[in-house]
């Protein structure tokens, strides 16, 4: 969508959305972006869409796969960050490298991102093309760095899984057993969820119960089905 709605789905009138956008996009292959931040519950929303029959491209999964598919990435890591991040089998020590990459300066982190992100974008585009070729009507890209890496410009509309910062910290602490400093490093390495609210079309408030989240997802699903 050219104009960013930036509204909570709990506040959006479904009939208004249908009248405004359904005719414009009727029959078009839709590329939807879902983003969030660490601990925002984005994966939960992604699974809900998948269970409703929408095909999902998982950018995190692709990020893991490109490490095996494109050897220059691991070579760059070993040469620039140290062999301690590569195990005896030639695989990336993900946790150790993750802790390191989020603790260094933004400039240094961007050097690594400039190596791996083009491969990730290539694989994402290939998957979109495949889904369109086999006749799918809609596909959702689940990508934590959707905004940071400017992927949204190639999508039809974007969705944010939003929670407040306190909820982020609590959820990540329970899930990943990280220190508060490690959690904050990861949160601060991304654009804040409050800033992302201004840059997306729809916002799902994922700070309450699963059922409240599901109601918002189902509303968006109904909207998607009219396109």
UniProtKB/Swiss-Prot annotation:
| GO biological process, any | coenzyme A biosynthetic process
SUPFAM superfamilies, per database record: P-loop containing nucleoside triphosphate hydrolases
**GO terms for cellular component:** cytoplasm
Q: E.C. number, please?
A: 2.7.1.24
What are the DPCK domain coordinates in residue numbering? 31-227
Ligand binding (ATP): 39-44
Q: Which CDD domains match?
A: DPCK
Q: Where in the cell is it found?
A: Cytoplasm
Q: What family classification does the UniProt entry report for this protein? A: Belongs to the CoaE family.
Matching entries from NCBIfam families are given as: dephospho-CoA kinase
User: What is this protein called in UniProt?
Assistant: Dephospho-CoA kinase
What is the source species?
Clostridium tetani (strain Massachusetts / E88)
**Source gene?**
coaE
């Amino acid at each position: 969508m050219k104009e960013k709605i930036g509204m909570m789905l709990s506040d959006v009138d479904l009939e208004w959305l249908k009248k405004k956008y359904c005719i414009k996009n009727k029959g078009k292959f839709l590329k939807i972006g879902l983003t969030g931040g660490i601990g925002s519950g984005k994966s939960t929303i992604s699974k809900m869409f998948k269970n409703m029959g929408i095909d999902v491209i998982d950018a995190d999964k692709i990020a893991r796969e490109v490490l095996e598919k494109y050897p220059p990435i691991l070579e760059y890591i070993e040469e620039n960050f140290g062999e301690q991040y590569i195990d005896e089998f030639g695989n990336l020590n993900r946790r150790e490298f993750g802790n390191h990459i989020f603790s260094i300066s933004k400039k240094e982190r961007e050097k690594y991102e400039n190596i791996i992100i083009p491969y990730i974008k290539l694989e994402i585009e290939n998957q979109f093309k495949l889904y369109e070729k086999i006749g799918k009507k809609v596909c959702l890209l689940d990508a934590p760095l959707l905004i940071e890496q400017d992927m949204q410009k190639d999508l039809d509309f974007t969705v944010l899984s939003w929670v407040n910062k306190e909820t982020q910290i609590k959820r990540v602490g329970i899930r990943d057993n990280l220190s508060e400093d490690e959690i904050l490093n990861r949160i601060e390495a991304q654009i804040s969820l409050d800033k992302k609210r201004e840059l997306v079309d729809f916002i799902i408030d994922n700070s309450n119960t699963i059922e409240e989240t599901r109601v918002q997802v189902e509303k968006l699903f109904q909207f998607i089905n009219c396109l």
